[in-house]
Amino acid sequence: PTSVTYEEGIYVGYRYFNTFNVKPSYEFGYGLSYTTFEYSDIKLSGKTFGDKMTISVTVKNTGKTAGKEVVELYLSAPSKAIDKPSSELKAFGKTKLLQAGESQTITLTLEAKNLASFVSAKNAWIAEAGSYKVSIGDSSMNIKKSAVFNVPKELIVEKTNSSFASDIQFTDLKQ
């Protein structure tokens, strides 16, 4: 072929399952452990987003065996002009080997680019104004803690040029 058209949009994998309420056999991030973990004390560096935000959560090994836990941060953007999945993985971190009863605080960082989506009509990466929900868990469907922060006004994260714009129309799924 002389050309190949990529026709896969933003609703791929867990983004599709979570947004359209489809239960997969194993959700994104699913894993087994020989122990159990408890999440507590979610803290944001502020209630209003500036140029970045840190999110911390304490993870405690509540089982009888030592183990490690992967902490996943999902972000839900305001449902406004930009079509987005219900949540997207934006950061993750792994604990050290936690002994039974031991805790560790994991700190993750969100930057403006983590909030942005590309808006072709504006040739820019934009973070919409509004309330954003941070969800922390061990998989895309097993959320343990959540918190909300606000973006007071639209942020233009990066402006681009429209070079080699395609003349092929693409219809993506919509919520």
Q: What name fits each language-model region?
A:
Residues 66-73, 85, 118-121:
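Short, hydrophobic/aromatic beta-strand segments
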Residues 63-64, 80, 123:
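Detector for glycine-centered tight turns/loop "hinges" at secondary-structure junctions
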Residues 81-120:
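Intrinsically disordered, low-complexity Pro/Gly/Ser/Thr-rich segments with frequent PxxP/GP/PP motifs
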